[in-house]
């Protein structure tokens, strides 16, 4: 399960030099010949990766995907990410797993609120808090997308 961030970086002739982006893709310290950097219009970053974090996946299905679990990509607003941070923080602090219960499914791994469950929640809080702070501090952010993959 992935949370990615897409940032628009298209260079336009009408932009002031200080507003233009430059993205260069190197391999082995040299620019790749098969990628024209002037045509790059978007940068996609992997913000989070969860492996078998079924409670978090269920949260996205219920709160972002309108209950539809179809492995498609869904846009996630920053306010929703903050809701997830707040919820995960509360569960880690109180150990009340009824707030974000583990889910069943053949592809989901453990349905116990074990050490891995709490590690996933703590990692989610740490990484998403850092990402949202970065967005706020730079006053620029991209668009976030969640996608499950089995």
Q: What residue ranges belong to the model's regions?
A:
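Acidic (Asp/Glu-rich) sequence patches and key acidic residues
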Residues: 1-150
């Amino acid at each position: 399960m992935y949370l990615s961030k897409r940032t628009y970086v298209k260079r336009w002739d009408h932009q002031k030099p200080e507003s233009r982006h430059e993205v260069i893709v190197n391999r082995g310290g040299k620019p790749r010949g098969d990628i024209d950097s002037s045509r790059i219009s978007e940068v996609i970053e992997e913000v989070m990766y969860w492996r078998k974090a079924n409670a978090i996946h269920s949260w996205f299905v219920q709160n972002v995907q309108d209950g539809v679990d179809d492995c498609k990509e869904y846009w996630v607003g920053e306010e929703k990410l903050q809701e997830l941070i707040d919820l995960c923080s509360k569960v880690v602090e109180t150990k009340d797993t009824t707030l974000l219960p583990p889910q069943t499914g053949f592809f989901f791994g453990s349905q116990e609120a074990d050490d891995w469950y709490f590690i996933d929640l703590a990692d989610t809080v740490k990484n998403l808090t850092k990402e949202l702070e970065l967005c706020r501090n730079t006053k620029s952010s991209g668009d976030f997308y969640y996608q499950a993959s089995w």
